[in-house]
From Swiss-Prot:
SUPFAM superfamilies: Prokaryotic type KH domain (KH-domain type II) (SSF54814), Ribosomal protein S3 C-terminal domain (SSF54821). This is Small ribosomal subunit protein uS3. Belongs to the universal ribosomal protein uS3 family. Binds the lower part of the 30S subunit head. Binds mRNA in the 70S ribosome, positioning it for translation. Pfam families: KH_2 (PF07650), Ribosomal_S3_C (PF00189). PANTHER family: 30S/40S RIBOSOMAL PROTEIN S3 (PTHR11760), SMALL RIBOSOMAL SUBUNIT PROTEIN US3C (PTHR11760:SF19). InterPro entries: KH_dom, KH_dom-like_a/b, KH_dom_type_2, KH_sf_prok-type, Ribosomal_S3_C_sf, Ribosomal_uS3_bac-typ, Ribosomal_uS3_C, Ribosomal_uS3_CS. SMART domains: KH (SM00322). The gene is rpsC. CDD domains: KH-II_30S_S3.
Length: 210
């Protein structure tokens, strides 16, 4: 079970929480679609800002969006000019008042989504996949990860037949629900086709009562 399922979804309600923090009865489907639209728009708009996670909170016709990023300066801009433009764009998209909260990711080497996007970017720049994987594994362990596993799937190195290669170092206990495992997925669009990159980072165990 732990081998197949998304590690974050598997731990929801145990040690992980939801990214959409709101409750609705009648308009649930409408708000859910709005959440997906917002996340898709922000991911494209802030592609080079290293966005790790987007959380959405709603109350009384207003939306508060928490953006976790490795490069907050790029989103905020000079004297907050960029963030104001972004607020207006989001308000136009949703017809609601939108609040933005930009949070910095202090250690991007321990964020699975950022690591996977970084590897995908390297693959697009024609860096050898094994080199990109090993470099990311080394830096994550250096910054305190207990274990990391990286999987690349596709026409690796321009091979005729697609295959899957993975590299693991340390422990990655997928069946242990108290294990704090971060998961990230990214796609590298190369001249040979799309290469999928999955990253699992084990940060330690979350003990009850803490």
């Amino acid at each position: 079970m732990g081998q197949k399922v998304n590690p974050i979804g598997f731990r929801l309600g145990v040690i992980k929480t939801w990214d959409s923090k709101w409750y609705a009865e009648k308009d649930f489907a409408k708000l859910l679609h709005e959440d997906l639209k917002l996340k898709s728009f922000l991911k494209k708009r802030l592609y080079h800002s290293g966005v790790s996670k987007i959380e959405i909170e709603r109350a009384a016709g207003k939306a508060k969006i928490n953006i976790y990023t490795a490069r907050p300066g790029l989103i905020i801009g000079k004297k907050g000019s960029e963030v104001e433009t972004l607020k207006k764009e989001l308000a136009k998209l949703t017809d609601k008042e939108v609040y933005l909260n930009i949070q910095e990711v202090r250690k991007p080497e321990l964020d699975a989504q950022l690591v996977s996007e970084n590897i995908a970017l390297q693959l697009e720049r024609r860096v050898a996949f094994r080199r990109a994987m090993k470099k990311s594994v080394t830096s994550s362990l250096k910054f305190g990860a207990k274990g990391i596993r990286i999987t690349c799937s596709g026409r690796l190195g321009g091979a005729e037949m697609s295959r899957t290669e993975w590299y693991r170092e340390g422990r990655v206990p997928l069946h242990t629900l108290r294990a704090d495992i971060d998961y990230g997925f990214a796609e590298a669009k190369t001249t040979y086709g799309i290469i999928g990159v999955k990253v699992l980072i084990f940060k330690g165990e979350v003990l009850s009562g803490k």
